[in-house]
């Protein structure tokens, strides 16, 4: 992970996301790109507001300390200023965001999610809701202020089927770069009950291609998958919850709409990785 993009739209949750993304950048020695939209750019120097194309991203040098640039950098003063780049788009457009992600070779997107909104609402008003459903990149959603200085403990919840193996390599690479302890979790529920032998065989098969000291294997009994994931994460004081969803339907692995349920109710940051 070398390039992190965080969206910023002047909300409290966006400030939480900015802080979390900056801490990740510091921890992983990555560059941080702060993406702003529309009116948020009013404080930037006029020359930085000129667009060759109305849809073309504008890049503000990190040393342009005026308006929003100065304000943003001051919020994350603990991060080396040389690692910060301000990006801008005139409006939210996920196709343009994906184009920017590709152009900058972004490895991870971080975005704040308003507590009062739900990701399965019929009207998708927030930037984060649209990003989760459309962005072609792993994305972390943040709702609360991250109190720690770094990510030390990660829960990876899955059904550990064959299609999870390939994207899990990327997830493990991220946790390795962060030097975080990873806990693999299988949640056993009444509606989809599996016996202990089946779960152990599944998780052992899944983990046989990886170093055993890279993570721990865990099973948790709960009424629902999301309940089990959150309960286990709280028990071990997890800093991040990771989950993999399918690109075409976005939220269908393990249980219907699992990722959106977790994002809606979790106070712990959620990392969603899409299967290509």
Which positions does each model-derived feature cover?
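Hydrophobic alpha-helical segments and helix pairs
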Residues: 96-144
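Structural beta-alpha unit
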Residues: 74-109, 210-260, 264, 268
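Charged helix-capping and loop-helix junction motifs
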Residues: 124-127, 198-202, 254-261
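Small/aliphatic-rich secondary-structure junction motif
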Residues: 1-53, 153-219, 238-240, 265
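Local beta-strand N-terminus motif with an aromatic residue
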Residues: 1, 105-107, 137, 151, ...
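Short, flexible loop segments at boundaries between secondary-structure elements
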Residues: 268-276
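Short secondary-structure boundary segments
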Residues: 36, 113, 186, 244-246, ...
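A short acidic, glycine-rich active-site loop
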Residues: 52-66
